[in-house]
Amino acid sequence: MAYAYLFKYIIIGDTGVGKSCLLLQFTDKRFQPVHDLTIGVEFGARMITIDGKQIKLQIWDTAGQESFRSITRSYYRGAAGALLVYDITRRDTFNHLTTWLEDARQHSNSNMVIMLIGNKSDLESRREVKKEEGEAFAREHGLIFMETSAKTASNVEEAFINTAKEIYEKIQEGVFDINNEANGIKIGPQHAATNATHAGNQGGQQAGGGCC
């Protein structure tokens, strides 16, 4: 299917926070309770619609282990959006956010949109990190924030789509150079065709005007 833009995402965070489950829920609308540890990087894609335009999300799901951190870093460079995930039932995953964020900002383009996600909101009885703490961290670092549940699908759709909306707004504002694919944005065939049609119509109008 033709698309106007392609946005590249990267999902980052500690091992076991539910990164692969979030991706699977978003792309396949299913939950897999037992998931093998991601080795290196996995990949998923899905089409969404923003402002009447088809946008393809290309999502890279990274390994959380320290031993794969160098591989993860190489994927930051071409990403327009990042989902930084922690587990609300494990405080250590929240405590490590600063390290992940520093790493992301050091190795990515400065305009990358980052969504902070507190995952496993369905496990309220085991919560170790208050929602207010997530909100405060996001505010302090200029991130978008949501709590999600990959199991129940709560806010999963919204997390991916709201990140895309933010990227799309930055394109409209001229913040992103869409001709530089290093920014994690690619102009699709649909967008190019629309522009060509628009240019053709303008040319036709001008030619018609000249004949009068």
UniProtKB/Swiss-Prot annotation:
The ranges of region (Required for interaction with PRKCI) come to 2-19
Signal peptide position in this chain? none
Q: How is its activity regulated?
A: Regulated by guanine nucleotide exchange factors (GEFs) which promote the exchange of bound GDP for free GTP, GTPase activating proteins (GAPs) which increase the GTP hydrolysis activity, and GDP dissociation inhibitors (GDIs) which inhibit the dissociation of the nucleotide from the GTPase.
> Could you say which residues bind GDP here?
16, 18-21, 119-120, 122, 150-151
Query: What is the membrane topology listed in the Swiss-Prot or TrEMBL record?
Result: Lipid-anchor
Cofactor needs: Mg(2+)
Q: Give the enzyme's EC designation.
A: 3.6.5.2
Q: Where does the record place the S-geranylgeranyl cysteine lipid attachment? A: 211-212
Give me the reactions it catalyses. GTP + H2O = GDP + phosphate + H(+)
UniProt's post-translational modification comment states: Prenylated. Prenylation is required for association with cellular membranes.
Placement of sequence motif Switch 1: 37-42
Q: Which residues does the annotation say bind GTP?
A: 16-21, 38, 64, 119-120, 122, 150-151
Localization (cell): Endoplasmic reticulum-Golgi intermediate compartment membrane; Melanosome; Endoplasmic reticulum membrane; Golgi apparatus membrane
Biological process (GO), any one:
autophagosome-lysosome fusion
Domains: what does the record tell us?
Switch I, switch II and the interswitch regions are characteristic of Rab GTPases and mediate the interactions with Rab downstream effectors. The switch regions undergo conformational changes upon nucleotide binding which drives interaction with specific sets of effector proteins, with most effectors only binding to GTP-bound Rab.
Its quaternary organisation is: Interacts with PRKCI. Interacts with TRIP11. Interacts (in GTP-bound form) with GARIN1B. Interacts (GTP-bound) with HOPS complex component VPS39; interaction contributes to obtaining a functional HOPS complex that promotes autophagosome-lysosome membrane fusion driven by STX17-SNAP29-VAMP8. In contrast with mouse ortholog, not able to interact with VPS41.
The entry sums up its family as follows: Belongs to the small GTPase superfamily. Rab family.
Query: What name does UniProt use for this protein?
Result: Ras-related protein Rab-2A
Origin species, per record, is: Homo sapiens
What is this organism's lineage? Eukaryota, Metazoa, Chordata, Craniata, Vertebrata
Give the gene symbol.
RAB2A
